[in-house]
UniProtKB/Swiss-Prot annotation:
Record SUPFAM superfamilies: Thiamin diphosphate-binding fold (THDP-binding), TK C-terminal domain-like
Matches recorded under CDD domains: TPP_E1_EcPDC_like (cd02017)
Keywords recorded for this protein, A-Z: Oxidoreductase, Pyruvate, Thiamine pyrophosphate
Gene of this entry: aceE
Single GO MF descriptor: pyruvate dehydrogenase (acetyl-transferring) activity
Keyword Oxidoreductase tagged: yes
InterPro entries (UniProt xref): PDC_E1_N, PDH/Transketolase, PDH_E1, PDH_E1_M, THDP-binding, Transketo_C/PFOR_II, Transketolase-like_C_2, Transketolase_N
EC number: 1.2.4.1
Identification of the protein by name: Pyruvate dehydrogenase E1 component
């Protein structure tokens, strides 16, 4: 007997004997004894334990839920089919009408056609909308199916004909975005799901964050479900699979993945020589997820019941994806010959069926009843997440144009015969005369279809997608005076990282917002001096702490609790950033603003997970990113991979990311208080903050009077070293500001040059302000000229800027400073380990290099002799012929 007859019991009596024996052992002697016996048998038969259990990770290529287990469908299948067909049609027309304008707009037809049934079952029976109690279900729509969601919203009356006619035409403000983008459609889309892989990752941490809110008793999220709709090709992304074990660890029974297994990615089959459904089943099952397969539609049920030999299931198991795809690109006769014809037993099963009936044998993802039962089952699962693997056909219903074709994803245009085929396939009531105009289907307001759509959505609380732009209940933001302990001179040396921790401690004592603070750490709390928070506010754990921590007797012991406030995400920057994003958008998804602070090694932020931070800009996130241990020369012992000299270059690429590089404790306090005001005060600005802090301890002075505005704007004059009328300006940020001050002293004392010292908290904000002024002036030639803020602070004397970042960072402002002579020093090149002094000499940002740069500018203006520059180079022992550190 073939070993592939997995589902066919050749000897039920023997099977029953084995089952009864094992049950008896378990009952009388326990599971451990049963396990011992099974392992003994495996050893005796020389089958490895791994190979034995491997078979449990992949089941037969049939539905998880049998037809006998199914419940009746609760909706009107006929009406829903008419609605679904109209949505399919309108989605296609939207793309074709846009393509007709010949604007090279693009658009995707095939992905939604393969998943329309899946979505419609959800819209009619599952998706709960935002309500008075909670934020409703949170849905991560697969990016490429956006036209289908627009098509439904159009039929609901939520989008106008003008809007859908402007699909991918957004500049004039009345179009629809190509994919889900909250930035572009702030009252519609909640979550950006492109680039691919971000959807599944963010959905996991969104579900975790809902549990966090629930367990901390901040908000009731118990009825909410997070859905992530994904493509089987998308599952190749590391982000798609990388966090699935987290979902199991956190027991996220509020999370459902629905993977549209149409077997195709952009260019061709996902796994042509294998079976992607089996691969995904093994992967998720092995991780601990509940796996529900929806492989075959109801038209297969009678054949499977007739299959007494097990040959049909064997055939289904043996057929690989490349073959399944080819079968669906042909016809019924081809399927009869090359699929059923493989075995006499299976050919016999279909002998009384016509070719058309064989062709109409449907896949599970196109059967509403099968999908309903899968989703219903998924909602009932407790203590673990669920993945539904729905077998579909890419380009379903598009016939020879795209159905099952490798080119399906690229189809943007369809000829008239193809359009007629689609019309007939879905019984669209449009005449041959009208079809050339590519008309939309519209339901009359009193029609059965229109009423049914609204009735079903009313039952579920309202419409989806929907996004809340501003939170409802105002927050009381602490005033700057609440941080007074950090505004005065500090008694002992400290780093700006410790200054941040002290700011955080003060906020955590503020009665109005303390419970809204979400400290997020990727396993570096002790590095940043934050271990004191462990006991103070606890580390969040969905199951509490079931062990006595090793350091229980210590003041700052490792305290986990269900109501813990800290999100400790382990060595997992992607996960930590995803938690930050969930918290940073809670104001919208939950109408409950949370204030996240994610602190991490600055080089492992934008460089490592920049795609997520770009998505955060799209999603209108509000919160704080703290790039700790920053600066190329400041994290001195960690070397090339850790020393950050470019995160500010990366952060400036995100338009709504506001970046600062403070040098003093009072600057940190002012910046964070201003961020709280801007993001969570009456303005509710859609921005987020990136603040770099350092691990170097030094003297922290008191805040000079009246500098608050300058700190927030990006620059203020710190001090002046007076000497003669000969003058230069020195400017710097972060760790290098002290080198600037030392250089000013040398210039004043040794060279009799008056030196103005400026603390530049944000070169990026200064540059943006300058660009805004220049743009305004260009477009308003008769209006009063706007002046860049930096020009109101600095003067025309030669200027030198030095930072612990690439020169490009300070170069941003060259065009806006009032001086004609401006020289920038920076840390271009790879980092390395040594003392801070040696590294600053190596990268040419030490006080001595700053002095030489200032003297050189004065020599260029003939204010001093070049000999002075040469002598300074010799005096400071600078090797003028050493290799450029950028190349070293």
């Amino acid at each position: 007997m073939s070993e592939k007859l997995y589902n066919y019991d050749v000897d039920p009596v023997e099977t029953n004997d084995w089952v009864q024996s094992i049950e008896s052992v378990i009952r009388e002697e326990g599971l451990e004894r049963a396990k011992f016996l099974i392992e003994k048998i495996l050893k005796k038969s020389k089958i490895t334990r791994a190979n034995f259990f491997k078979c449990f990770f992949t089941s037969d290529y049939i539905n998880t839920i049998s037809s006998e287990e199914e419940v009746e469908y609760p909706g009107d299948l006929i009406l829903e089919k008419r609605i679904r067909s109209a949505i399919r049609w309108n989605a296609i027309m939207m793309v074709l009408r846009a393509s007709k304008k010949d604007l090279e707009l693009g658009g995707h037809l095939s992905s939604f056609q393969s998943s329309a049934t899946i979505y419609e079952v959800c819209f009619n029976h599952f998706f709960r909308s935002k309500n008075d109690e909670d934020g409703g279900d949170l849905v991560y729509f697969q990016g490429h199916i956006a036209p289908g969601i627009y098509a439904r919203s159009f039929l609901e009356g939520r989008l106008s004909k003008k809007q859908i006619d402007n699909f991918r035409q957004e500049v004039d403000g009345k179009g629809l975005s190509s994919y889900p983008h909250p930035k572009l459609m702030p009252n519609f889309w909640q979550f950006p799901t492109v680039s691919m892989g971000l959807g599944p990752l963010c959905a996991i941490y969104q579900a975790k964050f809902l549990k966090y809110l629930q367990n901390r008793e901040l908000k009731n999220t118990s009825k909410q479900t997070v859905y992530a709709f994904l493509g089987d090709g998308e599952m190749d992304e590391p982000e798609s699979k990388g966090a699935i074990s987290i979902a199991v660890r956190e027991k996220l029974d509020n999370l459902i993945f629905v993977i549209n297994c149409n077997l195709q990615r952009l260019d061709g089959p996902v796994v042509g020589n294998g079976k992607i459904v089996n691969e995904l089943e093994s992967f998720f099952y092995g991780a601990g997820w509940k796996v529900i397969k929806v492989i075959w539609g109801g038209k297969w049920d009678s054949l499977l019941k007739k299959d007494k030999t097990g040959k049909l299931i064997q055939l289904m198991n043996e057929t690989i994806d490349g073959e399944y795809q080819t079968l669906k690109s042909k016809d019924g006769a081809y399927v009869r010959k090359y699929f059923f014809g493989k075995y006499q037993e299976t050919l016999e099963l279909v002998k009384n069926m016509t070719d058309e009936e064989i062709w109409n044998l449907n896949r599970g993802g196109h059967d509403p009843k099968k999908m309903f039962n899968a989703l219903k089952k998924a909602k009932e699962i407790k203590d673990k997440p669920t993945v539904i693997l729905a077998h579909t056909v890419k380009g379903y219903g598009m016939g020879v144009i795209a159905e099952g074709k490798n080119i399906a994803h690229q189809i943007k245009k369809i000829n008239i015969n193809g359009i007629i085929y689609i019309r007939d396939r879905f019984n669209i009531p449009i005449s041959n005369e009208d079809i050339k105009e590519l008309p939309y289907v519209v339901f009359e307001k009193n029609s059965k279809e229109y009423c049914y759509m609204h009735q079903q959505r009313k039952k579920l609380g309202g419409y989806i997608p929907f996004r809340l732009s501003k939170f409802t209940n105002a927050l009381n933001i602490p005033d700057l005076i609440d941080f007074k302990s950090l505004l005065k001179e500090q008694n002992k040396k400290m780093s700006t990282t410790i200054a941040f921790v002290r700011v955080l401690n003060l906020i955590l004592k503020n009665h109005s917002i303390k419970n809204l603070i979400v400290p997020i750490i990727a396993d570096e709390a002790r590095t940043f001096g934050m271990e004191g928070l462990f006991r103070m506010i606890g580390i969040y754990s969905s199951i509490g702490q079931k062990y006595v921590p090793q350091d229980r007797e210590q003041l700052a012991y490792y305290k986990e609790e269900k109501k813990g406030q800290i999100l400790q995400e382990g060595i997992n920057e992607l996960g930590a950033a995803s938690s930050w994003l969930a918290a940073a958008t809670s104001y919208s998804t939950n109408d409950f603003p949370m204030i996240p602070f994610y602190i991490y090694y600055s080089i492992f932020g934008f460089q490592r997970i920049g795609d997520l931070f770009w998505a955060a800009g799209d999603q209108q996130a509000r919160g704080f990113l703290i790039g700790g241990t920053s600066g190329r020369t400041t994290l001195n012992g960690e070397g090339l991979q850790h020393e950050d000299g470019h995160s500010h270059i990366q952060s400036l690429t995100i338009p709504n990311c506001v970046s600062y590089d403070p040098a003093f404790a009072y600057e940190v306090a002012v910046i964070i208080q201003d961020g709280l005001r801007r993001m969570y005060g009456p303005l509710q600005e859609n921005i987020y903050y990136y603040i770099t802090t350092i691990n170097e301890n030094y003297y922290m002075p008191a805040m000079p009077q009246g500098v608050e505005k300058g700190i927030c704007k990006g620059i203020y004059k710190l001090k002046t070293f007076y000497a003669t009328e000969l003058k230069v300006q020195l400017m710097g940020s972060g760790a290098i500001l002290r080198c600037i001050c030392k250089a000013g002293e040398i210039l004043s004392n040794d060279y009799c040059i008056t030196t103005d010292i400026y603390s530049v908290t944000s070169f990026t904000e200064l540059a943006r302000n300058g660009e805004d002024c220049e743009r305004w002036n260009m477009l308003h030639p008769y209006e009063k000229k706007r002046i860049a803020y930096i020009k109101t602070v600095m003067n025309s004397s030669p200027a030198v800027a030095a930072t612990d970042y690439m020169k490009l960072f300070a170069e941003q402002i060259r065009h806006y400073i009032p001086s004609n002579e401006y020289h920038v020093l920076g840390t271009d090149g790879f980092g390395r380990s040594d003392s801070r002094d040696k590294l600053r000499d190596h990268f040419e940002v030490s006080a001595y290099y700053i002095v030489v740069a200032a003297l050189n500018l004065l020599a260029k203006l003939n204010n001093i002799n070049k000999k002075v520059v040469e002598e300074a180079i010799i005096k400071f022992n600078i090797n003028a012929d050493k290799i450029n550190p950028r190349l070293a």
